Every structure is written in structure tokens, then in C-alpha cells.
Amino acid sequence: MAPNKLAIASVSLSQYPGHILDHKIRAASQAGIAGIEIVYSDLLTYSKTQNISIQAAAQKIHTLCLETNLQVLSLAPFENYEGATTPLKERLALGQHWLEIARLLHAPYLQIPSIYTTDCSRDEKTIISDLQRLSDLASSAKPVVSIAYEPLSWGTNCSTWEGALSIVQRVERANFGLCLDTFHEGTKLWGDNASPSGMQMDAEVKLRDSLRRFVRDCPRDKIFYVQLSDAERFETPYSLAHPWALPGEAKEFTWSKHARPFPLEVEFGAYLPVVDIARAWIVDVGFEGWISMETFDRRMVNGQVTPEMAAKRAVESWRKVQVEIESKSRL
């Protein structure tokens, strides 16, 4: 079995408002999960239920994680930062707040998804400069926080691991690297929720070539952590008439919000080649760092799926992925 430690995003343990962050943390720990990505909105909800500041909430959550032997992996997601039209001074002030919370949580990473708004700068120098300023802010106090940059499949300026790696290399900061997610690789190059087949044209070739280039070109030390999730095949192909569709929203974003089960949960329609991606990203490059489950399953919204149930699903999913990786490696 792979030596990687398993983490999970707090939102992937439940999206029901009545399931509070401390409950999720205990459930993850009891299931044998080693780490957790704290989603800011979950922490904010917890602070309100406790009637305390978000800073005090972060300190309490850190203490709870120590008591339950759970490591905070990251604070996420600091969205739509690089190249945004709002003044950089305001964005850096917000970034400073997020970094303060990350340090109180003792989170080694602040996760930043690639910007996905349309009203943003396309200028490469601006994008790189913005990310350098944030990285420098993150390293200006102790403990240093590292920036985990995640290419979204619907990102405006960056939507592939290759684009993200190029940005990482140009930002050129020790505390700036990659957060890689199988959902984004799978939906950018292989899956298509608007196609009756569920697949893009030349899907297998595009994905295979991408993974080969990844193994050849991606430096292992710039992979900060890897997120795993699958995607559900749409029974009725996506269109603007689909009940989940929103005007102006990318179809991959819609897909992400509603239909991202844990890897290999075929009973929920999971069908992406997650094992192929995970094998390249983890085994073939010798990555031994954190693996985190980041799923968005609409079945978790109404409260019928408890954090305990979700945590068990996550552990079983990771077990299945490891078994499949080993099985394919022997072929």
C-alpha cells in the first residue's frame, strides 16, 4: 500500500448546516483519517455557533485536532485572487487575514484555486507579481505558510497542471507549489458532462499524453499535496436547460458543485479514470506526501449522510484506489 497519509476536506464530510466542524473533526479521527483541510466557511459557521471570533474558533479547532490526533493540512479556498480587478492592497489585506487564520490552525498550506472570474487581468506579469506578493507575505512571519496553487478545469487563465507548473516556476518561491486534483485533470482532458458518451473526443489519448508529460516534467518537490475525487456521469447530458445550470457558469463548475463522489463510487455514477491519474501523480513520480479527499456530493446536503458515514466512505475509497493502483501496476 502507498505510504501517503490520508486527509479530507471538511466540506467533504457533510454539506448539511447542522453538521458543525467539531463534529466533522471527531468523525474523521474516529475513522482513522490523519489530516483535514479546513474550509473557511465551515470555520466561520463554527465560530458563529460558539459565539466567538473566527480567530478564537481557529485556536479551539487546533486544540481539538491535537486532542483527536488530526493534523490540519490546509485552509481553503482563497479564491479569485491573482489578476482580480479589486486593488491589490485590499486583496493582500484579505490574504493577511487568511494567513493569520492558517497560522492559528497550524496549517502548513493556504490553498489558492486558479482565478475563474471573467473580469480579471490576462497579463502574465501581473498574475505572477500578485502571486509573488502573496507568497512573500506568507513567508514574512513564522511559521511560514506555503501557497498550494490549484489549477481549476474552468480556470480563466490557468486550467491545467502544465499551466500551473509554469506559474510555479515563474513565481519562483520556495513556499509556492502545486495542489493537484484528479477531478480537474479528468474533466479538462477526458470527461464531458454535455456529451451522451460522457467523454471528450480523443479522451484516452489526451489524458495518456498528459500523464506521460507529468511524470517526465513535474518536479516532485513542487507537488505539495494531491486531492482525489471522482465525477458522476450525467444521465441527462448537461445543457443550459439542465436543472443545475446557472447563466454564465462553466459546465465543469456546475459538475463540481453537484456531482463529485468519492473515487470509484460507481454506485453513485463515478466513472473518471481516477486510478490512472493517481498512479501517475503518486506512484510513478514517487510522491509520498498528503493525499486528500475533496468531494462535493449533493447527497450530503440534507443531513441524511452523517460525517461518520462520509468519513468511512472516504477511507474505503482510498483503500479501493490503492488496490486498483497495485493491481494495474502488476499488469
Where are the regions a protein language model picked out?
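Glycine-rich, proline-tolerant flexible connector loops at the mouths of alpha/beta enzymes
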Residues: 37-65, 114-121
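C-terminal helical cap(s) of enzyme catalytic domains, especially alpha/beta-barrels
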Residues: 302-330
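Hydrophobic faces of well-ordered beta-strands that scaffold small-molecule active sites
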Residues: 4-10, 36-38, 72-77, 110-112, ...
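Boundary/entry segment of secreted carbohydrate-active catalytic domains
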Residues: 1-20
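Acidic/histidine-rich catalytic cores of soluble enzymes
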Residues: 36, 133-268, 325, 329-330
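A short, acidic, flexible beta-alpha connecting loop/helix-capping segment that sits on the rim
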Residues: 13-16, 43, 292-309
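Acidic (Asp/Glu)-rich catalytic clusters
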Residues: 2, 23-31, 50-74, 93-106, ...
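Active-site acidic/histidine proton-transfer and metal-coordination neighborhood
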Residues: 64-68, 81-180, 187
